[in-house]
């Protein structure tokens, strides 16, 4: 349908051009000519050519939640990074740069941050951004408690605005990771949100807090703004020309994030020049076909992500540590790596090895059938495995996941486990993992670190705060582990902090909390007429910032 609409639009444009060219020129009534004036050189009408829009289109696994207090997956994070500004911005070196905050002061005790805001920043309605908007945005994500709320509100004592250009944030304990966490505090206009808030809703005097409206609109100040958003199909954004920042001279005028990963559709769109960049969820076979299209390349991009088999620690038979260890020893990791893009590596820790603070000296699980059988013999379900099947749910939008599920099924069947493999849409898996009763034995999910250090990913993957979200199907809910993570994150000295990360790493390995498969390398097929800084390693790999549209150049016919 989209293709037909696009084709119709092109036909209409061509028709208008042809009609303009064929229209009769203005004439005057001819007079009787006895003598003729010398011929004068004629010039064609000087109508300015209509500038061709630069368009960028990328496919994503859907849905795309663009409410800054709700979205936290890949599509949502990429959209939010372009629609909203943040106080600081992640750089390619793993640190942060000034953004809405041009500078900040830190108190001697390390617990009070005073941010000085950039002047003249406009929201998409033309109103000026003020410090009170920062406070409102923080309060909103804290009260709603979704999205990246667990990250940006953790350990924060208070947020205030003494004047329009100053924000003061006080934290409970010094933390080296507080400042980087602010790349997830997307600043929304208080006035715009309030003007579109329904009085009735679950947030007391805040009604619905603008959640219904913000599903399909934005209240940001970022380089792009929502033009239209039919929820199930695509998000269309247009350049915000009053953005305070600097655009690539060839930055797209419009960007369309398309909600499909279906291989035939993607290939057709690329062949027809109706897609500039694919999602990262195509199969190896699909990437091979895409790479044969003229003007298309496939780029491997390092990430902060890992591929997890999230093992439910609360349901039989995986609530028994010996069954979990049997699984971790019984999986053929090396064979699994051959199913992926060349160059991927087995996960050697509970978080990706690309993160600072991973202890590479800690032993990790390798394929060892004898050890797997020895552990299984100690499992309390050893004699009744047929009565306690392992339910594996893989994401239908990521077809390559089926190969891993079938390999897992074969490996575990050899040990004596009964395994049922289920193909489910991403939205269904998100819903299933939200409640213990509906959580499968294993959910197969890619997770990207919110920040480029191990501690934050231990928090987002294994702390009680993320149980009941798609980021944790393990349901650990262990106060002792929570305390370890909190203590490590509050440790300012890097050497001491990394030592505490090592202890957490050993703890999770000893529990066999998950089946850790491989450190992800994203693959994107892209048209070579698009200038992508991320392909050259010039962007942060914090999820969503790889495709910051203001830095992308489009020079496609």
Enumerate the predicted regions with their spans:
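N-terminal lobe/hinge region of extracytoplasmic solute-binding protein
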Residues: 59-108, 139, 219-221
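Gly/Pro-rich hinge or "lid" segments in bacterial periplasmic/extracellular proteins
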Residues: 91-95, 186-247, 254, 370
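Structural transition elements
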Residues: 224, 318, 345-379, 396-404
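Ligand-site clamp/hinge motif
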Residues: 242-288, 418
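Ligand/substrate-recognition segments at binding pockets and active sites
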Residues: 25, 29, 58, 230-233, ...
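Aromatic- and charge-enriched surface segment that lines or borders ligand/interaction sites
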Residues: 102-147, 162, 168-170, 269, ...
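Surface-exposed binding/hinge segments that line
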Residues: 150-202, 230
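Detector for C-terminal structural segments
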Residues: 230-234, 239, 330-359, 400-409, ...
């Amino acid at each position: 349908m989209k293709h037909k609409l696009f084709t119709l639009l092109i036909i209409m444009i061509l028709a208008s051009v042809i009609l303009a060219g064929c229209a009769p020129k203005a004439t005057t009534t001819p007079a009787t000519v006895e003598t003729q004036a010398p011929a004068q050189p004629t010039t064609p009408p000087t109508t300015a050519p209509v500038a061709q829009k630069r368009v960028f289109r990328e496919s994503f696994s859907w849905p795309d939640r663009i409410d800054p207090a709700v979205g936290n997956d890949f599509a949502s994070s990429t959209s939010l990074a372009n629609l909203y500004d943040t106080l600081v911005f992640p750089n390619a070196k793993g640190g942060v740069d000034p953004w809405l905050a041009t500078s900040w002061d830190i108190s001697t005790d390390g617990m009070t941050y005073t941010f000085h805001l950039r002047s003249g920043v406009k929201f998409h309605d033309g109103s000026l951004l003020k410090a009170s908007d920062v406070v409102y945005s923080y309060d909103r994500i804290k009260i709603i408690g979704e999205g990246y709320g667990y990250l940006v509100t953790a350990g924060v004592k208070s947020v205030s605005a003494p004047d329009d250009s100053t924000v003061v944030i006080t934290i409970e304990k010094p933390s080296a990771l507080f400042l980087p966490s602010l790349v997830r505090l997307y600043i929304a206009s208080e006035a715009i949100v309030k003007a579109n808030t329904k009085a009735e809703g679950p947030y007391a005097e805040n009604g619905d807090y603008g959640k219904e409206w913000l599903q399909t609109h934005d209240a940001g100040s970022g380089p792009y703004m929502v033009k239209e958003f039919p929820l199930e199909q695509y998000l269309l954004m247009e350049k915000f020309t009053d953005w305070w920042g600097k655009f690539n001279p060839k930055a797209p005028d419009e960007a369309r994030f398309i909600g499909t990963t279906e291989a035939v559709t993607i290939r057709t769109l690329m062949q027809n020049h109706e897609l500039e960049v694919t999602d990262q969820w195509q199969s190896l076979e699909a990437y091979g076909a895409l790479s044969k299209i003229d003007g298309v390349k496939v780029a491997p991009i390092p990430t902060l992500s890992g591929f997890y088999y999230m093992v439910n620690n609360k349901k039989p038979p995986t609530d028994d540590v010996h069954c979990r260890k049997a699984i971790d020893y019984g999986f053929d990791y090396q064979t699994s790596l051959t199913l992926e893009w060349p160059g991927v590596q087995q996960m050697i820790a509970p978080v990706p090895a690309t993160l600072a603070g991973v202890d590479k000296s800690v032993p990790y699980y390798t394929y060892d059938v004898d050890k797997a059988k020895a552990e299984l013999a100690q499992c309390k379900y050893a004699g009744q495995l047929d009565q306690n099947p392992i339910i594996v749910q893989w994401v239908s939008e990521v077809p390559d996941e089926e190969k891993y599920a079938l390999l897992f099924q074969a490996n575990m069947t050899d040990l004596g486990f009964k395994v049922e493999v289920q193909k489910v849409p991403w939205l269904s898996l998100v819903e299933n993992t939200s409640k213990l009763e509906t959580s499968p034995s294993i959910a197969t999910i890619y997770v990207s670190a919110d920040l480029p250090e191990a501690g934050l990913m231990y928090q987002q993957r294994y702390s009680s705060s993320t149980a009941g979200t798609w980021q944790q199907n393990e349901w650990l809910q262990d106060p002792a582990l929570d305390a370890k993570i909190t203590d490590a994150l509050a440790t300012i000295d890097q050497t001491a902090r990394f030592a505490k990360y090592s202890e957490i790493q050993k703890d999770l390995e000893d529990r066999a909390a998950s089946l850790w498969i491989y450190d992800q390398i994203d693959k994107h097929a892209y048209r070579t007429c698009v200038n992508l800084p991320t392909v050259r390693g010039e962007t942060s790999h914090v999820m969503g910032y790889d495709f910051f549209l203001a830095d992308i150049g489009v020079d496609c016919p």
